[in-house]
């Protein structure tokens, strides 16, 4: 049986298509999913109703006139592939990131607005 280092070296040598097939095979074999878990906002027991919101959804409402720059910015911010980022921008309004901290949400909003996008924090 291969040790951990040998497995990692084998993975490093794989193409993106081979890695995609590997992930699918692992999902089927072990009955798991490779999707990242989405952090759900926990209910605060007896929390103050006026408490400041700590998690935000960043929604792209419009790509504006610089769609190519917006697609690149969305791709960089989300880690999506070029095709998926373009599809997300083409289908605006869409949520780009969910449940992010206020600072990160504001930073992402600023980055997207710099390239001409219209963004809302919800």
Swiss-Prot record:
GO terms for CC?
cytosolic large ribosomal subunit
The protein's superkingdom reads: Bacteria
Q: Lineage of the source organism?
A: Bacteria, Bacillati, Bacillota, Bacilli, Bacillales
Give the similarity note.
Belongs to the bacterial ribosomal protein bL12 family.
One annotated GO molecular function is: structural constituent of ribosome
Record's PANTHER family?
A: 39S RIBOSOMAL PROTEIN L12 (PTHR45987), LARGE RIBOSOMAL SUBUNIT PROTEIN BL12M (PTHR45987:SF4)
For this protein, the record's Pfam families field holds: Ribosomal_L12, Ribosomal_L12_N
Q: Which Gene Ontology BP terms does the record give? A: translation
- CDD domains for the chain: Ribosomal_L7_L12 (cd00387)
Q: What is this protein called?
A: Large ribosomal subunit protein bL12
User: Its function?
Assistant: Forms part of the ribosomal stalk which helps the ribosome interact with GTP-bound translation factors. Is thus essential for accurate translation.
Q: Does the keyword Ribonucleoprotein apply?
A: yes
Gene source species: Staphylococcus haemolyticus (strain JCSC1435)
């Amino acid at each position: 049986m291969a040790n951990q280092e040998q497995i990692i070296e084998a993975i490093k040598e794989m193409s993106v298509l081979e890695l995609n097939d590997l992930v699918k095979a692992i999902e089927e074999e072990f009955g798991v999913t490779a999707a990242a878990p989405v952090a759900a906002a926990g209910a605060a027991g007896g929390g103050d109703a006026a408490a400041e919101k700590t998690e935000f959804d960043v929604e792209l409402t419009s790509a504006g006139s610089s769609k190519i720059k917006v697609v690149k910015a969305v791709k960089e911010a989300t880690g999506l592939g070029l095709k998926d980022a373009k599809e997300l921008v083409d289908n605006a309004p869409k949520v780009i990131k969910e449940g992010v901290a206020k600072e990160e949400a504001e930073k992402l909003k600023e980055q997207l607005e710099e390239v001409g996008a219209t963004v809302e924090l919800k």
